[in-house]
Every structure is written in structure tokens, then in C-alpha cells.
UniProtKB/Swiss-Prot annotation:
Homooligomerizes. Interacts with FloT. Interacts with FtsH midcell. Interacts with PhoR, colocalizes with PhoR in FloA-only membrane rafts. It comes from Bacillus subtilis (strain 168). Found in functional membrane microdomains (FMM) that may be equivalent to eukaryotic membrane rafts. FMMs are highly dynamic and increase in number as cells age. FloA and FloT function is partially redundant; double deletions have marked synthetic phenotypes. Flotillins are thought to be important factors in membrane fluidity, especially during periods of rapid growth in rich media. It is found in: Cell membrane; Membrane raft. Residues 312-331 are annotated as: Disordered. This is Flotillin-like protein FloA. Its main location: membrane. Disruption phenotype: No effect on KinC activity, a double floT-floA deletion decreases the number of proteins in the DRM, blocks the ability of KinC to stimulate biofilm formation. Single floA deletion has no change in FloT localization. Double floA-floT mutants have marked defects in cell morphology, motility, and transformation efficiency. Single floA deletion sporulates less well. Double floA-floT deletion makes no biofilm, has greatly reduced FtsH, sporulates less than either single mutant. The chain crosses the membrane at residues 6-26, 28-48. GO terms for cellular component: membrane raft; plasma membrane.
Length: 331
């Protein structure tokens, strides 16, 4: 092959390699698109983005969109927000939506909201089109002991100024639930709540529950009201059952004490009987001693024996004539 031909082929190969490397590092088509859209951006700026590990189309495309919308946003602002981990496209879309809705929103504020983890585009849309939050059934007990369940619909609008650091929807729902329970609990009876559900919404709405949150409460509407359990009757029943158990326990305690006292009395009776038997055993000894010393005579001793015999005879008659019903009652 002719050396001149080889030289031409080598030059062509080198040119192809150089062009491939050039188009790899320099997004020419993106640069042309920016120029066609009227965005003045240097090709060296795009190369610098490559070197700073910034994907050029993630910055240039939102820049073109912002330029067409008439926003005063620079390349450095978008690139710095991208390097900070923000969503450049969502920020630009939020700025465009805010401009169309005549909402005052700067790029710095929008970028701060995005970096805080909030969906700034959704917040702008919610400022234009308020969101309805529906709570579950919230139960409260009126003063007459009847449980009342209420479901509310809360219409909120995003507060752009409080998106950073403001509480979310969960706080709104919790505060509204607390207000509903408090309003129902302060009602004299459940019929007032059923007759005038607006009383709940008006009372809750007047408490300023959106303080410190990222939302502004526009209205609170009671969607449904239902009657629950008779909590007062249940509590009274439980109290009566508890009182009954306490009374039974006290009665059982008194019965046990009575049984113990009865056993104690029986023991004392047996003790007294033992003492009587012991004393009776000493009587013959005392009589013998009296006879020995001459304190009593033989006739006195015989009279005593006759009296004992009469007493034993009367006891035997009494046992024979005792009423059987007395034995049944004792048994």
C-alpha cells in the first residue's frame, strides 16, 4: 500500500478518535439546543460541568425551561443546587408554577425548601388548589356518658413561609382530633352534638390549630356523626360489680372471723370444763379432810350425797324429756 495512503488513513483514524473524545466530554447537541432556545452558555462551561461531575442536561434543560418562562435564574445557582443534592428540575417547575399563580417565591427559598426534604412543587400546587384531609372516626364522651363518634374533613392550604421547620399533616389531624374530643366532652348531652354538628367545627376552628405547622386551615367540616357505646352505663356496671365483689370479700372476711371466734369460744368452753372437772376432783379430797378434822359430821356428809343423787336424777329426767327439735336445730 502506498505510504501516502497509510498516512491519510492514520490521520482519519486519529481524527475520529479525537472527535469521539471531544463529543464525549463536550455535549455539543445540548449546547446547540441551549443556543437555539436563546440561552447564552459557553461550551467551556459545559466542559467544566463534566469535570465537576455534574450531568450537564440536569442543569441546562431546567435552565432552558426557566429562560422560556421568564425566570431570572443563573447557571451557577442551578449547578450549586444540584451539587448540594437538590432536585433542580422540581425547583424550576415550582418557580414556574408560583409565577403563574402570582405567588411570591424566590429561588433561594425554593431551594431551601427542596433541600429540607419537602416537595416544593406539591406545596405550590397545594397553595393554589387546597388539599382535603379526612380524619378517621374520633370518639368522645359527652357529660351524660354517651359516646359520640365524629369524622371530619379538614381543608388545608400549604404555607410556603412555614414549610421549613413546620409540622406536617399528622400534627393537624392530631390537633383536630383533640379539639373534637374536647368539644364533645364539654357538651351537656349527646343530643346537642347530634342536633348541631357545626358546634364542633366552629369550636375547633377557633382554636388556631394551624399554629407552628406548614399548613393553613381553611375549614373544618364534620362529615359524619355516629353514636357509640353508653360509656356511663358501662362504668356504672363495672363499679357496681366492683362494689359487689368488695362486699362479698368483706362478708367472707366477717364469716371467717366469726368461725374463728366460734372455734375460740369452743376451746375456751372445753378449757372451762376441764377446770370444772379438776375442781370436782378436789371436792372428795376436801370432804375427806373435813371429816378427818371434824369440821363436818356423818349426817352432813349423807345429806350432801342425797343432794348429789337428786341432782343426777333430775339431769337424767331432763335428758329423757328434751325436745328432739332442739337437737335438730343444734345439728
Amino acid at each position: 500500500m502506498d505510504p501516502s495512503t497509510l498516512m491519510i488513513l492514520a490521520i482519519v483514524a486519529v481524527a475520529i478518535i479525537v472527535l469521539a473524545v471531544f463529543f464525549t466530554f463536550v455535549p455539543v447537541m445540548l449546547w446547540i439546543s441551549a443556543l437555539a432556545a436563546g440561552v447564552k452558555i459557553s461550551i467551556f462551561t459545559l466542559v467544566g460541568m463534566r469535570l465537576r461531575r455534574v450531568i450537564p442536561n440536569r442543569v441546562v434543560n431546567p435552565l432552558i425551561k426557566a429562560h422560556k418562562a421568564g425566570l431570572n435564574v443563573g447557571t451557577n445557582q442551578l449547578e450549586s443546587h444540584y451539587l448540594a443534592g437538590g432536585n433542580v428540575d422540581r425547583v424550576v417547575n415550582a418557580l414556574i408554577a408560583a409565577q403563574r399563580a402570582n405567588i411570591e417565591l424566590t429561588f433561594e427559598r425554593c431551594a431551601a425548601i427542596d433541600l429540607a426534604g419537602r416537595d416544593v412543587l406539591e406545596a405550590v400546587q397545594m397553595s393554589v388548589n387546597p388539599k382535603v384531609i379526612e380524619t378517621p372516626f374520633i370518639a368522645g364522651v359527652a357529660m351524660d356518658g354517651i359516646e359520640v363518634k365524629a369524622k371530619a374533613r379538614i381543608t388545608v392550604r400549604a404555607n410556603i413561609e412555614r414549610l421549613v421547620g413546620g409540622a406536617g399533616e399528622e400534627t393537624i389531624v392530631a390537633r383536630v382530633g383533640e379539639g373534637i374530643v374536647s368539644t364533645i366532652g364539654s357538651s351537656d348531652n349527646h343530643k346537642k352534638v347530634l342536633e348541631n354538628p357545626d358546634m364542633i367545627s366552629q369550636t375547633v376552628l377557633g382554636k388556631g390549630l394551624d399554629s407552628g405547622t406548614a399548613f393553613e386551615i381553611l375549614s373544618i367540616d364534620i362529615a359524619d356523626v355516629d353514636i357509640g357505646k353508653n360509656i356511663g352505663a358501662i362504668l356504672q356496671t363495672d363499679q357496681a360489680e366492683a362494689d359487689k365483689n368488695i362486699a362479698q370479700a368483706k362478708a367472707e372476711e366477717r364469716r371467717a372471723m366469726a368461725v374463728a371466734q366460734e372455734q375460740e369460744m369452743r376451746a375456751r368452753v372445753e378449757e372451762m370444763r376441764a377446770k370444772v372437772v379438776e375442781a370436782e376432783a378436789e371436792v372428795p379430797l376436801a370432804m375427806a379432810e373435813a371429816l378427818r378434822e371434824g369440821n363436818i359430821g356423818v349426817m352432813d356428809y349423807m345429806n350432801i350425797k342425797n343432794i348429789d343423787a337428786d341432782t343426777e336424777m333430775r339431769d337424767s329426767f331432763g335428758k329423757l324429756t328434751k325436745d328432739p327439735s332442739d337437737e335438730d336445730r343444734k345439728s
